[in-house]
Amino acid sequence: MKQGAVICGLAIVGVLAASPASADMSKAFGNTIVSHYPNGQWVRHYFDPDGRYTSQFSDGRRVAARWSAEGDKICLSGFSPRQILPRFCSRMVEADVGDTWRARDPLGRNIRNELVAGRR
């Protein structure tokens, strides 16, 4: 299995893992996960080693939360501002910078996630 970072399929995100029991988020730290919507909108997701998560939406909105690895999932909770769902978990996906994968956002909409080098 190639070394990956944890990228959650939420928009609010998507994540990569060396193994489900031990999420290796290192490739997500310092990089950006971009969720692309079919209508051209996007969400940029940022994970920090200390459990902080932030996102920026194409319409200017920003969201903050805490992330945690739980088995084969990455979960977000403690959203600020509050969201429709108080907690959202997404399966882990193995990926490297430049990789893309399909997922669904918390409302069930199709998205294409991409792990992009650097913070954008």
Task: Label each region the model flagged.
Residues 9, 18-120:
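Lipid interaction determinants
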Residues 1-8:
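Bacterial N-terminal signal peptides that target proteins for export
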